[in-house]
Amino acid sequence: MTAPTLIPKYKPLFDAPENVRYFIITGGRGSSKSFHVSDAVLKYTYSAGEKILYSRRTMTSAHISIIPEFTEKIDMYEVNDSFYVTKAEIINITTNSGILFRGIQASSGNQTAKLKSLQGVTCWVLDEAEEQQDEDEFDTIDFSFRKKGKNTRIQPEKRFYIAGEQ
């Protein structure tokens, strides 16, 4: 299979400088945001030690909406033997790096404490970030992932309130 042609504006997702912490991904329906983010995140799993947290406000239907975006790439690149896929995570068995799918809000309320307790997160993707209106809650999760000597990439998708935008 020939690798897909990537849209140039998404190139920084694949080869960002070390000092870049945030990528804010914007675009309308059909702008290939989900395609490029899932492609980049899947490729991150080929580096040992990557622990990617992929979150939305709620993740009740991740197995029918988000995870298929990743399994599509796994099929497209014909690397099925390299991945173990469940309803809550995708593990690259060649590197032991993985993607964890978690909601910020559980059905019983806020789940921030559980997200903060995740150790070693190297990348956080906040999908549908416009649903995340509580800046303090964002900061609580964001600051818990800062690791000395490790650049954690945070990728809020769509309009977001960083730098005072609301």
Task: Cite the ranges covered by each PLM segment.
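Phosphate/NTP-binding elements of NTP-utilizing enzymes
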Residues: 1-166
